[in-house]
From Swiss-Prot:
Involved in Mg(2+) ion dislocation from EF-Tu: region residues: 75-78
Protein name as it appears in the record: Elongation factor Ts
Keywords, in A-Z order: Cytoplasm, Elongation factor, Protein biosynthesis
Species lineage: Bacteria, Bacillati, Actinomycetota, Actinomycetes, Propionibacteriales
Source organism: Cutibacterium acnes (strain DSM 16379 / KPA171202) (Propionibacterium acnes)
Primary location: cytoplasm
SUPFAM superfamilies hit by this protein: Elongation factor Ts (EF-Ts), dimerisation domain, UBA-like
Presence of the UniProt keyword Acetylation in the record: no
Cellular compartments annotated: Cytoplasm
Family: Belongs to the EF-Ts family.
Pfam families: EF_TS (PF00889)
GO annotations of cellular component type: cytoplasm
Gene Ontology MF terms: translation elongation factor activity
Keyword field contains Protein biosynthesis: yes
Length: 270
């Protein structure tokens, strides 16, 4: 099958592989993106198990109470529009009042004038002339703490983190929000990683070890080590704490008397 330049670019952006390596992997995978990523990982042309850090810079996140919303736009020109920013805060407040814990629930939430969030976004898109949509929404019923991060001072917040927790050490809770914003964990703990994902990582790690010529008798040990690295990168509680990299996030939270129940991280462009 013919491989397009756009497909090659997408794979290069996601893996950091060279153009010819990316094209060869896509050809071998018959255009299957995920399979091509694995081929590059096994061959050593891509670094292991990382989502692309390249994110579109458009849209914003907004929060109210125990709710966090992510609203997407096509350009950062719109993201800086005062009417767009005001609408985002109005939408966050409506989502919080409704206890909307999903995108669909937030779109159906009522605004003060009786219209819905979905209606508001449709009207705003028509007025501005650009696609605007609610990309995601979350609401926590327990103790919640929110952190909003600006990638650029001339733009509204584009990364939002919300955690649900037990404990009284707000400084520690805020610190873990900074950790989530900076390190983009995918899961809270390794217990939450789906079994098929773990098995996939085991398979890829074994293939990489064999490609490197490692003796078969030590491959299981190598796989366990690389799987530990995967958990350390992708599971929040296993990550080294940015406040003290000699401790894990789990250790710093335990010392602070804080239990983290769950978290969400929204980022403009994701």
């Amino acid at each position: 099958m013919a491989i397009t330049a756009a497909e090659v670019k997408k794979l290069r952006d996601a893996t950091g592989a060279g153009m010819m390596d990316a094209k060869k992997a896509l050809t071998e995978a018959d255009g299957d993106f995920d399979k091509a990523v694995d081929i590059l990982r096994v061959s050593g042309a891509a670094k292991a198990a990382k989502r692309s850090d390249r994110e579109a810079s458009n849209g914003l996140v907004a929060a109210a109470g125990s709710s966090l919303v992510h609203i997407g736009s096509e350009t950062d020109f719109v993201a800086k529009n005062e009417e767009f920013i005001a609408a985002a805060h109005e939408i966050a407040e409506a989502a919080d009042k409704a206890g909307a814990d999903s995108k669909d629930a937030a779109n159906a939430a009522a605004l003060a004038d009786g219209t819905t969030v979905g209606d508001k976004l449709g009207e705003l898109a028509a007025k501005i002339g650009e696609k605007i949509e609610l990309a995601n929404a979350a609401h926590f019923d327990g103790n919640a703490h929110v952190y909003l991060h600006r990638r650029s001072q001339d733009l509204p917040p584009q990364v939002g983190v919300m955690v649900e927790y037990e404990g009284d050490n707000i400084e520690a809770v805020h610190g873990v929000c900074l950790q989530i914003a900076a390190m983009s964990p995918r899961w809270l703990s390794r217990d939450e990683v789906p079994a098929d994902v773990v098995e996939h990582e085991r398979t890829v790690a074994a293939d990489i070890a064999r490609e490197e010529g490692k003796p078969e008798k030590i491959i299981d040990r190598i796989v366990e080590g690389r799987l530990g690295g995967f958990f350390k990168e992708n599971c929040l509680l296993d990550q080294p704490a940015i406040s003290d990299d000699k401790k894990t996030v789990a250790q710093t939270l335990e010392a602070a008397g804080v239990t983290l129940k769950r978290f969400v991280r929204f980022s403009a462009g994701e």
